[in-house]
Amino acid sequence: MIAKKLVVLLALCAVANANPAQQTPPTTPSADPSDPRVAVAARIPGARVDELRATAIPGIYELTRGSEIVYVTADGKYALTGDLVELATNNNLTEEHRRELRVKAISAFPETEMLVFGPKDPKYTVTVFTDVDCPYCRKLHSQIAEYNRLGIRVRYLLYPRTGPNTTSWTKAEQVMCSADRNAALTRAKLGEELKTKPCADNPVAKSYALGQDFALEGTPAIVMADGEMLPGYVPPDVLAQHLKDGK
């Protein structure tokens, strides 16, 4: 996990040398040279920084990209990885913010660009990053009726783990370009060949980018309504109990 966060941090810095036209500017510091954000911005000019804010620790700032979080010193010289825990309450402040960021990002993703399988009156809704060719994603989907029976509404976001210009990516595009997307997903997960041609107007790149922002390390990845993320396959009854306990 530490190595993953360092990669994310290095990626933030590397953006400065990438295509400037596609960069998202960092949080704008004030003109006051005593503002610590000036030093941080100077260390990573042009990097994609979604948010830079002070923490409860003097001189330590929180830097976010997607739902990934690292900490930097006020002078911008040092970076810290790991979770910030408030010992008095045992609250994981980093994870709390990650969850907020995930909820915000998923809320902004149109449900019309997801694949939704759910009962008429669901008790819970989860968002699942899935790969057509992932064995455990296929196992999860083979039990979709049981998830639904337990009151769980599943919203899929396609995340081809192999990335663009691969067979899994093409299959994902074929699913999203089908007249009946849900049926196409089920057929694809059963290993059936889809005849649909990929279309230009599909959300696969968008859902993949969201998964990248969430620093997914595999699929399936199940995101709860409160932003908690469970990596890997979770059986229907176990997920239902987890959701019930979290209410």
Regions from the PLM with identified roles:
Residues 41, 45, 139, 145, ...:
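Sec-exported extracytoplasmic/periplasmic mature domains
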Residues 117-135, 153-156:
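Short active-site neighborhood of thiol/selenol oxidoreductases, capturing the structured segment around
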Residues 97-127:
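Glycine-rich adenosyl-nucleotide cofactor-binding module
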